[in-house]
Amino acid sequence: MTAIRYEFIKTCKQTGARLGRVHTPHGSFDTPTFMPVGTLATVKTMSPEELKAMDSGIILSNTYHLWLRPGHEIVREAGGLHKFMNWDRAILTDSGGFQVFSLSDFRRIEEEGVHFRNHLNGDKLFLSPEKAMEIQNALGSDIMMAFDECPPFPATFEYMKKSVERTSRWAERCLKAHERPQDQGLFGIVQGGEFEELRRQSAKDLVSMDFPGYAIGGLSVGEPKDIMNRVLEFTTPLLPDDKPRYLMGVGSPDSLIDGAIRGVDMFDCVLPTRIARNGTCMTSEGRLVVKNAKFARDFGPLDPNCDCYTCKNYSRAYIRHLMKCDETFGIRLTSYHNLHFLLNLMEQVRQAIREDRLGDFREEFFEQYGFNKPNAKNF
């Protein structure tokens, strides 16, 4: 019996998107879903109760950051991440690989792992597949990720080929080092950049190892959206139908819908809380920057079509005032709204799949949001 089980419910006849449910040791969640990111064992400014109120069934935490602060041994002593942060629903932890490759100025990759510098104090550190498993086993997440190499975009075919081969060898080492397969599901990560041949090789290698789920990595790293969609189109069919598929680091509304249409079940991104901190809000009518002067006397909600706590209780003028005065409550209100917006969007996506009309929903949403305009603004 594995810790993670995927239950397939139906396919959208119009698009091929999947409706499903993922079962974990800490409850189940419906898919496609968006996972709020709690990098340091907290979704910035949000309480667990607030996340539950917006119906979040799973959140993400970060292995690299929790290894550095407070240290995985302290989290283990606390009884694991769920107890430490008072969250009784599912948690996914990433492997730390992305942070090693994106945050550290110095890094040296070798077969054993990666030498790099701590981005906080410059200390030399070493992270290997075995260490990534040790940390995640101590954290006790429901879903943990294999340690992979995260090449930048663009990368040459030759470099990417070596990287994919190394990632496959590291994935095998992760499986061997994983000490808690009965209560923690380990996902493999398909790499290969924009190269179909390498994505095929990576998927073939990882599927042969029979992971309980699969992530599609190396996207949302600077490539244009049409390349991301093309890669998804040839990658998701390579993955088993009876396992969850997770697209890492994607959180803009258009990409969530386009990813679901291409067979993705799970998404995560810091985007909704990061942009909330500078007053940028996702609304049913497009991007809204609440700090703008034109909202100083606007006493309507951030989004007239939203029923979240923020929109039911506070005006654009009030939230603008809080943001201009650097009041933390303003960030809480915009963060709550953006997270609610994406979680609610995914519920709308699931409903559209149930009704076999996700293609129509995409057209309506893109038209209303303004994604169809030639100068459409993203986040």
UniProtKB/Swiss-Prot annotation:
The active site is at residues 94, 268. It catalyses: 7-aminomethyl-7-carbaguanine + guanosine(34) in tRNA = 7-aminomethyl-7-carbaguanosine(34) in tRNA + guanine. GO terms for molecular function: metal ion binding; tRNA-guanosine(34) queuine transglycosylase activity. Its cofactor is Zn(2+). Pathway: tRNA modification; tRNA-queuosine biosynthesis. Pfam families: TGT (PF01702). Binds 1 zinc ion per subunit. HAMAP family: Q_tRNA_Tgt (MF_00168). This is Queuine tRNA-ribosyltransferase. It comes from Bacillus mycoides (strain KBAB4) (Bacillus weihenstephanensis). The gene is tgt.
